[in-house]
Amino acid sequence: MAFSFGNAGGGGGGVTQGKDLEVIQTEGLGFLALAGDAKVQLTSKWSPPPAPTASLLSIASRKGLVAAAGPDAVHVATTESVRKAFLAEKNGDSEVRPFNPEAKLPLPLRISQLAFTADEQYLVLSAETGGGLRAYDVNSLTQGNTQSAFELATNGETLRQLAPNPMPESAAFCAIVTTNGNLYMANLAERTLVSGPNGPTLRSQVSCAAWSTKGKQLVAGMADGSIYQMTPDGTEKAHIPKPPNLGDYHVSSVVWLENNVFLTIHNPTNSTNPDDKTVYHVITRQQSSGSPPNFTFQKLNDPVEPFVADKTPHHTVLRLKDFPPNLQDLLLVSSTAVETIGLLTRSKTPLATDKPADAITNVFTTTELADDSRRAQLPMSEDMMETYPIGVALDLSSKEKVYKPIPTDEEIEYSPGPLPGLWVLNNEGVLASWWVVYNESIRAGTTYSGIGGSSEVIPASPAPALASSTAPVPAFASPVSKPTFGSPSPATPAFGGPSALGTKASPWATAGGAASSTPTFGQPSFGKPAAPAFGQASFPGLGQKVSPWATGSTTSAAPAFGQSGFASAGTAPGKVFGSSFTAPSSGGFASFATKSGFASLSAPSGGSSIFSSKPGAPLTSAAPEVSMDTDTAFPPPSTKTDKPAFGSSPFVLGSTFKADPTAAHDIEKPKEGESKSLFDTGFGLSLEDAAKQPASAAESKDEEMRSTTPPLPPPTETKPKSIFESTTPTTTPAPQKFEFKTTTPSGFSTLLGSTKPVASSMPNIFATPKPTSAEKPKSIFDTLKPKEESKENLLKASEPPLPPDTTSKAVFQPGSSSSESAESSPGAAAKAAFKVGNDETPKPQKELAPKPEAVPLPPDFVKAKPKTEAKETKAEEPAVSPNLPVKPLAKKAEPIPAVPESASEEEQGQAEEEEAESGEEEEEEEEEGEGEEEEEEEEEEEEEEEEGEEGEEQSEAGSEGSGVDVAKDLSPTAKFGSMTPGYTPHTSLGGMAESTFSTISRSEVAEQSRPLFGEITKNAPPLFPAAGPLPVSPRSPSPVRGVVRSSILRPTETPRPVDTTPVPSRKGLLQKTASFGMSTGQKPAVDPNVKAQRKLAEKLKAEEQVLVDPEDEGIQQILQSKVEPTLRMNEFLAVDTKLAPMKPGRDDVPNACETLWRDINRMIDRLGLNSRSLQSFILGHTSHGKPGGRQKDDLEKPDDWVLIEAYDLGDMIDNKLARELEAGRIKDVEGTMAAIHNLGRDLAKLRAKEEDLRKLFNAQVDPDQIALTKALPLSAEQLAQQNELRRSYASFSKLLTEAEEALTVLKAKLASANAARGRRGAGAAQVPTVDAIIRTINKMTSMAEKRSGDIDVLESQMRKLRIGSLGPAGTPNGNGVGAGTVVPATPGGGGRSRESSPFVTPQSSRRAMFMSPGSVGTATPRGLLAATGTPSPTKKKLSMYTAEEKRELRAREAKRKATLRMLRESLARVGPNVVRLRDDD
């Protein structure tokens, strides 16, 4: 669309070219660097640099936050921490200080626009490629959540400008100008784009936009140079024409200053002419009612004009309005073509004195800073290249006063209050910061309004609730949201989707049928246009790039296989603008393919945002994806337990599960259909509900490492990883990241390709009405519902290993650990248990009985498969109580020895000892073992139920419990095949009577006899009736142990908090159902290992050994040795025993007793060592005191002090030091401060003088400086002194001459007087009188003049002959004539004065005395040249003569000397001749 306004005013109004505005230089404004030359590396360097229109820095002043976008991440930090970074120590020669932000949001693509809304509720981002908007809730960001609140699409168009509304009450509106020239208006409250008369595009051909000061209307700068005024819904209110006499220019930037005052910046459009420069105008509109408006255009000089116009600049204008006392407007202008910051000002009082006051007051002026040191200029890059701003923002969050705001004013120490800050981010990622200093404000004691958080903070209004059919949107747009009311039907997205239950339909397109347009193999849906679904409006247009924020192809609601992000496959299909049901896209900001715009939060989605994993996602685990292979019966991605993010190594010592911040909710049952907020659930959600949020980050790590089963095929590992580390667990049966309510099992799309829907008949292992723990976080150990775990989950998340125990863990098959009995390896039983997971409650396990055979776990020792019994048992079990803790799946443990014979020699030795003790009773033990086991298992079930109740609380507390340790303690004894350790209080694991248990492979046993994770819920009836009260655990008491289980007796693990997970339930189930067939009465065949073990027992009888802890002897020696005093406490020793496990083939009871004995001994040893450490520490601090007590000097060596000297220290501090400090305290504080102030002022003056002296010394010492100084012309003062000196010298010469004359006269008179006296004497010679002498002189003078005339005539004649060769004749100075001499006339016309002739006789010494320095004819340079330029014979060099000439000259000289000698001799002979003159002569 083109507009041709020419110079016509809007509505026929007039257009006037006003007078150009002034340019002034002022000292009343300036910038003060925050910390000298210091800069901060806020983000990494951009390469290639961002677009010139990028705006990558924004500050929320009231909350004190700053956000800056780098090429790889968005950095969010507090402004205070950034300011402190400026004051950090300098690193080397670089002035750039490093900085680590409080929050960092890694991004897969680059950002082009970033801004906080005016109410500081949202941080809005836009991608450099594909555009779109992504909004983050600022409050959630500050709490560590990194999920976006929502996203909006911009039709695949990249943003040129993002202009949030400036008023907090209207902060929901955000103007968007795209690079295609389209103007959109985003309504963040409704999370959609405002639809105007022409749809979402309010106007095309727009180049920029700006809001009014009250945020009620906005103006749009057009590509043709004109401006439109409109309302946020696109209704046009006014039109401002293009400035007159302006060529092909577009509006680059516009600022709405007042209702009728605008500032515009026009740039040439596609111009190659370097003379086409940026043009600034202040437009004033006058309009009387009923008449068209008149516009006055006044030009302003460019405050940031580039030196070389080699590129079209992009300008950013920041405004400080009403800066008291007199500054009405201060506009800070930055340009991408210049590294400096320019100023435009409007002041009530003149800021400069060299212009008329009325010309520069109350009008805008281009303001230059007179003091270069107070200018703001970006630093050079490391390679000394110029940089340019990519982000400019005002910091009004400071609360500190500024030291020396006006450096030249020594009287002002601090500013009256905080100052506005200007922050500029350049393309190197370096942040420069200055304080904006208004001198008049500093001196008047005023502060800029709104600074330091003084402005009223308008609370951010929450986004309107979405339609009831959609899940509540979490603060960070957790895609895990489920239908708010548990509606199994997919909910439509709040924006862009078909209306559902009042959901507002997207203005961008009509709802279309769900299509199956999923990303192609390896094609990320992020940032790519989605294929319109059937019936989908193709708003983006054919071939147009769709915003990466909300891109997604339309597809069924079923999640793509391995898909992550916010586009849940099983959720209500969402749509990007123009698509009714978008396919779940993985990756990209718009992996929220199923969401309207940029992730409709209203619909539960399952894709992972490329921006971050859901809070429930593992820290570094990939976003949730379909967690099962293609053959799985459970398509929902969330059904798979997330694979550990940190490999499969076992956990380190410590609780596997950390405290759940939302533990209070963990105990609650998930509510059907309740939406799960990514952060509402807290950390540590129910393991069983993959759709539920994972546990805390710590839990995720721990749980990840407990998986013991091998990972599944790659398809499940292709899930994209979250850019932001989630703080939630990874392997707690990872809560379904984004619920996949599989409404239609369509093909699953994934970044790596699409796979056909798996088990479409079972859209979700979690029945569509899934309980959501989002609002009611579930304990990590919460009951696991079959729906939550697909068989893939079980396989993927193998048995969570106990904290690292090389011996016990190695003995157990995956899932066989005593402490992990509740979570035996997800083997066939586990898979079978939940092959059908569509319902809320677990289905009978019998149905899945055959499945385990398909995937046997590692070494299957015995093929006897009482699995059927186990499965039947599971089938009999009711649904696991949602409140019962569930053992989370975790990282797979280290490989486990498969055969009991592989036990170490030490184990065998111990086993032999046990056999020796129980030798002949083995067979009886086997028979009795069944009975005992049955009773004990029943007791364990009861105990299990109690533990289940307590487990929730303890799981919330993050304690694994000694149950885990003991499980490992017992696990060594369970090395009988896959035997799972029993609870010592109830049964002795490892009894040969139970050896039949070992005949069943561990995986099978686990699979057969346990629920998904092997736990018995407290709601589930015991498989076997309780057999009486629980036996007391033989384990020693522990303050951290609640319910003690038999599994706690493992000797090889340090005691831990009670593991309240219902581990024993699985063991009991396994042992009863699998080994003894207590439920079904089936017994497996006799374990072949039993015979071998019996033979081994016979051998052990002969080689009976005493059961001894291998470390016991050394520890006893240490305990019996003398206690050595020490001043440092040794580290507390926990029971980290690494004793070799007991050998298999022993009776349960003896084996358990031995384990218990070793464990107790180990604990006692550790207690002794800890006690010894305390004794050494106490002894050291009681015996190493300084004799005679401590003195003040001892304070210099704090390490030498001991605890018993604390009293000396207290006395010293309270008495001696206190008195000395009091004595040294400054009494006259004010006087001292005044003296210091005076000294400071004097010091400043001295420093200034020192600097002057240093410059003076340099000028006198440096030869170059001296030469330069001499070459400089004389100053006016020096010239005056020179002239005065010349006048004085002339006067002195005149006086001297007069004195000489008077002296001569005096001598003459004396001579006359002597002569008179001499006549009286006889024969006295007469002396001539004065008169006679005067007459003689006059006569001689006349004779000389006569001769002079003759000489002049002769000179003239000679000149005619030779002078032409000596110099140009006829010129005033060509023949040596001095300045002012008379040029000779034509031949015969008279001679010239011989005074100026080069042949003139030198003046007598007397006459020279009458000459002043300025009276010489050659005083001028030309005269000097004339006087000295004419050559004379005497000045001819000897080398210039020939040999002949030399002989001639020598001969002449000889004659002359001879003549002179003859003259002297003659005069000597004649003697003096006295001539007497008469008076008449």
UniProtKB/Swiss-Prot annotation:
Polar residues compositional bias: what residue ranges? Answer: 724-734, 741-763
- Which GO terms fall under biological process for this protein? mRNA transport; protein import into nucleus; RNA export from nucleus
Where in or outside the cell it occurs: the entry states: Nucleus, Nuclear pore complex; Nucleus membrane
Compositionally skewed regions (Basic and acidic residues) per UniProt: 663-677, 773-794, 837-850, 862-877
Q: Does the record carry Membrane as a key word?
A: yes
Q: Which parts of the chain are coiled coil?
A: 903-957, 1233-1318
Q: Where is this motif: Bipartite nuclear localization signal?
A: 1345-1352, 1435-1442
Q: Where is the composition biased (Low complexity)?
A: 607-616, 814-833
**According to the UniProt entry, which residue ranges have a biased composition of type Acidic residues?**
903-955
Name the keywords, alphabetized: Coiled coil, Membrane, mRNA transport, Nuclear pore complex, Nucleus, Protein transport, Repeat, Translocation, Transport, WD repeat
Presence of keyword Coiled coil: yes
GO molecular function annotation: nuclear localization sequence binding; structural constituent of nuclear pore
Q: What does this protein do?
A: Functions as a component of the nuclear pore complex (NPC). NPC components, collectively referred to as nucleoporins (NUPs), can play the role of both NPC structural components and of docking or interaction partners for transiently associated nuclear transport factors. Active directional transport is assured by both, a Phe-Gly (FG) repeat affinity gradient for these transport factors across the NPC and a transport cofactor concentration gradient across the nuclear envelope (GSP1 and GSP2 GTPases associated predominantly with GTP in the nucleus, with GDP in the cytoplasm).
Quaternary assembly: Component of the nuclear pore complex (NPC). NPC constitutes the exclusive means of nucleocytoplasmic transport. NPCs allow the passive diffusion of ions and small molecules and the active, nuclear transport receptor-mediated bidirectional transport of macromolecules such as proteins, RNAs, ribonucleoparticles (RNPs), and ribosomal subunits across the nuclear envelope. Due to its 8-fold rotational symmetry, all subunits are present with 8 copies or multiples thereof.
Q: What is known of its domains?
A: Contains FG repeats. FG repeats are interaction sites for karyopherins (importins, exportins) and form probably an affinity gradient, guiding the transport proteins unidirectionally with their cargo through the NPC. FG repeat regions are highly flexible and lack ordered secondary structure. The overall conservation of FG repeats regarding exact sequence, spacing, and repeat unit length is limited. FG repeat types and their physico-chemical environment change across the NPC from the nucleoplasmic to the cytoplasmic side: PXFG repeats are especially abundant in NUPs on the cytoplasmic side.
- Give the protein name, as stated in the record: Nucleoporin NUP159
Q: Which gene encodes it?
A: NUP159
